[in-house]
A protein has these predicted regions:
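Formylglycine-dependent sulfatase
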Residues: 2, 18-238
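Sec-dependent N-terminal signal peptides
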Residues: 4-13
Length: 238
């Protein structure tokens, strides 16, 4: 299953002046849940509204051949935190929490901490690995605190948004902005009212998620750290 994965870097990163001034850039990693490339404007969806994600793509660059090796939430996140295949670690079954030797397979934030980074994770960990609490590798495993991040530079901060989770297609059509009958369906879905309703609700969910991305970027800008921060956006599997 293809997943959305797009990096946005400092545009002038190659310049000698900037490279000497920012030896270790901050890293803001924005993640969302379940949406794949078909639900984002910068990947060709002309109907969905994702101006903030599209803006990141226009300013930086995006990947077009990136795939989730374990396309379920927690197994996919186990590959993020270790850089290893889920089948290698035995974490591919959902909620398996297979124990791995952490002295041999460190978490990504462990490596960043070892070179002086302050590492934070905005509430959700869910890395599907046993033998160690997911929160133990973070300096701050709860909500993002921009003031603290500025005091602790350089930082690596994960911010996770739930709005695009597939469960947002459930429930009644209440306060839905997109019109179900105008929704463009994929060819592999039957054209029935229930599918159109799900599409309309999910378009709205992705739009709300994109607003949260915009809020995070605005907070980063207001903190005064945007010019020394690499921003990464990805969904967890799609």
């Amino acid at each position: 299953m293809k997943r959305l994965f797009l990096f946005v870097g400092l545009i002038a990163w190659g310049s000698g002046a900037l490279a000497s001034r920012v030896e270790r850039p901050n890293i803001l990693w924005i993640t969302s849940e379940d949406n794949n490339v078909n639900w984002v404007g910068c990947y060709g969806n002309e109907w969905v509204e994702t101006p903030h994600i599209d803006g990141l793509a226009a300013e930086g660059f995006r990947y077009t051949e990136v795939y989730a090796n374990a396309p379920v939430c927690a197994p996919s996140r186990s590959t993020w935190i270790t850089g290893m295949y889920a089948v290698t670690m035995g974490t591919q079954p959902m909620r398996s929490r297979n124990v791995i030797p952490h002295d041999v397979i460190p978490y990504y934030p462990d490596l960043l901490r070892s070179v002086g980074y302050y590492v934070g994770n905005d509430n959700k960990t869910d890395y599907n690995i046993g033998g160690r609490e997911d929160q133990s590798c973070w300096d701050n495993p709860t909500e993002v605190n921009w003031k603290r991040l500025k005091e602790q530079e350089p930082f690596f901060q994960v911010v996770n948004f739930y709005e695009s989770h597939e469960s947002r297609t459930q429930g009644d059509l209440v306060d839905i902005e997109h019109v179900a009958m105008e929704t463009r369906l994929r060819a592999y879905h039957p054209d029935v009212p229930e599918i159109r309703q799900n599409y309309a609700k999910y378009h709205d969910a992705v739009k709300r998620m994109d607003r949260r991305v915009g809020e995070a970027l605005a907070a980063l800008e207001a903190s005064g750290m945007a010019d020394r921060t690499i921003v990464i956006y990805t969904s967890d599997h799609g």
